Amino acid sequence: MTPTLGLSQAAVEDENWPQIKQRMIERGLKYESAWEFYKALEVDSEDTTLSPDEVPDWSGLWERPGGAPRWFDSDQVDSKTTANLKGEYASMFNEILVSAEQGQVWDPHSGCGQARGYPGMLKNGRPHEFAVTPHQTWHLGQARNEVRRIYTDGRGHTPEDWAYETEHGDSIGFWDGQTLITHTMYTKGGWTGRLMPYLSTALESVEIWKKTDDQTIQADVWIYDSEALETPWYTRQIFKQIHQEEGSPLRLEYWWNCHSQNNIVVQEEDGGTTFLDLDFTDMDDK
């Protein structure tokens, strides 16, 4: 079944987006694995490392346009994922949809600061921050205190006999001019978001990151998963810079967990609920 597609941010910014997206999908289909794709990109690149004065400026805070995206693929408009699932992963996703129709939606990441992990953190609607250096790029997500390190110093992945799965996996990359190209593996797979599919630990990906203008960073993402996907899953993830008043820079929330003041819900006298008052100000913030 072909999923229904909507008007994504990419489509809003480029009227030729449907044709561009199809070319990107076909690009991923040329390779049997994300690693093969990544190595082909590396061969074609001009530079693989940057000097300090060549590092791009990705400073500031960034957010997903239009608020928190509902789906990993912003072209998707209903609950039919654009991922081409197979086997038990297709069955699990169908069970999720059936449960949702009955009013039961599973969301283990909505409380207690449990990391969404990779690739789910890419779609997170809370602020993002990027710390770019010649040898590493850090992608930080405010929600759930997520930190993803992408090594660009020429190292390979953790050797297989030392490696184990983690929430964000093991990411390496290189620079092609001002474009960051990454490969990720050794993730825990798992759940990608509310009413979205599960993926396996066989997941690996290629991402192509670049700043397209002063206000926009985009990432073209191809996810390969030999156990969960029939074909690579391509999406474009877009991040817009959050406006900041001069002299009053914004920052990520210091800490995110069950006990963060803005996450504690308490019962009111009338039986309703509200968030607990912040204790570092005398102002009434109800």
Label the predicted regions:
Residues 5-286:
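PEST-like low-complexity, intrinsically disordered acidic/proline/serine-rich tracts
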Residues 1-3:
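Sec-dependent, cleavable N-terminal signal peptides
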